């Protein structure tokens, strides 16, 4: 698929990071450089990591590297919002999974039916962000994860990168995120899989009160005793200005103001 050696690819990818890669990102550089030239069937790379560990930076670096060596790249996400975010940090267009992999048709009774579209891409790397949101139902009486895999690997020499945070809430009806379970994917779909988990918080991200507090809470959970007991989470408002204590009586007015300023999709 790629004429470059793993060493050359690693050097190119490393140079695309805006900072010195963390240990986890350095491992990703190593794994991705081998993943990209592997001749094994149905090559899949899972990149896991919670907020602040540099997933976005890493995917941006990967996309720029693939473009530099002229490898076709398709960016996908489960929702329109996630696709917009992905496009903004990668610099190229992104689509929802549904829009890319399904094609509509009409039944004889006039009702709509959807089927998997033909994958006409060749030697293309598909990168799917927010993969933890991908469940086993698409709302179209079909299995979204299965359909995604069938679509991608029906193309000629195509590869798949799944990016997500398995600490996020899993899809409705699932106890965990099926798209991030390496053993399950390998056994049920005959994939050749490598997994890289980013665990170190990028130093710049700790300047964010939101991420710093989330990181502290995660450490509390991980350090809970054998009975699962842990201290009630405490929010540190002194880290930075992006966390504000909001009295309950002010919540509705604040939400209305923010919705008016940024729109409903811009406020969580």
Language-model features, listed with the residues they occupy:
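Hydrophobic positions on the alpha1 helix immediately C-terminal to the Walker A/P-loop
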Residues: 58, 62
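Conserved helicase motor core of P-loop NTPases
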Residues: 4-9, 32, 40, 153, ...
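The conserved Walker
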Residues: 51
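Conserved lysine of the Walker
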Residues: 55
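Pre-Walker A (Motif I) flank of P-loop NTPase domains
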Residues: 39-45
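N-terminal pre-P-loop "Q-motif" helix
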Residues: 18-37
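Inter-Walker segment of RecA-like/P-loop motor cores
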Residues: 74-126
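Walker B catalytic acidic pair
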Residues: 129-131
């Amino acid at each position: 698929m790629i004429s470059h050696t793993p060493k050359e690819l690693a050097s190119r990818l490393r140079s695309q990071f805006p900072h010195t890669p963390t240990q986890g990102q350095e491992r990703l550089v190593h794994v991705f450089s081998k993943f990209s030239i592997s001749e094994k069937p149905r090559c899949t790379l899972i990149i896991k990591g919670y907020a602040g560990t540099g997933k976005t930076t890493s995917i941006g670096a990967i996309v720029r590297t693939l473009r530099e060596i002229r490898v076709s790249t398709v960016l996908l996400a489960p929702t329109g919002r996630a696709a917009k975010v992905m496009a903004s940090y990668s610099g190229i267009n992104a689509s929802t999974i549904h829009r890319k992999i399904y094609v509509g048709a009409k039944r004889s009774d006039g009702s709509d039916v959807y089927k998997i579209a033909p994958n006409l891409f060749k030697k293309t790397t598909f990168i799917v962000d927010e993969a933890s949101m991908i469940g086993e139902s698409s709302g179209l009486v079909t299995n979204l994860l299965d359909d995604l895999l069938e679509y991608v690997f029906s193309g000629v020499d195509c590869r798949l990168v799944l990016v997500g945070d398995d600490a996020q809430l899993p899809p409705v009806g699932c106890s965990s995120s099926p798209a991030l379970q390496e053993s399950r994917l390998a056994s049920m779909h005959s994939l050749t899989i490598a997994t890289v988990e980013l665990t170190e918080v990028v130093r710049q991200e700790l300047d964010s009160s939101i991420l710093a507090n989330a990181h502290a809470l995660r450490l509390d959970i991980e350090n809970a005793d054998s009975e699962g007991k842990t201290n009630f989470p405490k929010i540190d408002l002194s880290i930075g200005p992006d966390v504000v204590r909001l009295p309950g009586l002010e919540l509705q007015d604040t939400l209305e103001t923010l919705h008016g300023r940024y729109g409903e999709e811009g406020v969580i």
